[in-house]
């Protein structure tokens, strides 16, 4: 699982606080565009910018919990779509799940050019 926003360590939905516990694999970058949606980010898997995140090995049970948090349901096309993409971590290419934001949700939203949610400017 590649996480880039509120699921990162120290953020509101820190994946390391969820059960069953995930195993940290490493830091990674993917190609994409990160948008500031207010309380959380969204990433579109397009563009030549990089998005910074963390990779975790997760169980199917934790995947189901994460799907609930991100409101991903197989029957519906909602805010996030679950994708599987190749991610390079410490010289190994892994197939990782990532939650991609739907196009209609980023219209008019600000791009975070450095692609790092943890470095965003605090809300005023």
What function would you assign to each model-found segment?
Residues 1-124:
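Glycine-aromatic micro-motifs
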């Amino acid at each position: 699982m590649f996480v880039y926003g509120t699921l990162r360590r120290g953020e509101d939905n820190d994946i390391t606080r969820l059960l069953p516990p995930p195993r940290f694999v490493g830091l990674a970058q993917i190609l994409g565009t990160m948008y500031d949606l207010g309380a959380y980010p969204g990433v579109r898997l397009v563009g030549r910018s990089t998005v910074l995140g963390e990779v975790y090995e997760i169980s199917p049970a934790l995947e189901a919990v994460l799907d609930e948090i991100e409101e991903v349901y197989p029957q519906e096309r909602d805010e996030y779509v679950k994708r599987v993409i190749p991610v390079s971590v410490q010289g190994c290419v892994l197939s990782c799940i990532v939650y991609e934001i739907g196009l209609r949700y980023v219209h008019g939203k600000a791009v975070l050019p450095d692609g790092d949610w943890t470095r965003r400017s605090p809300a005023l």
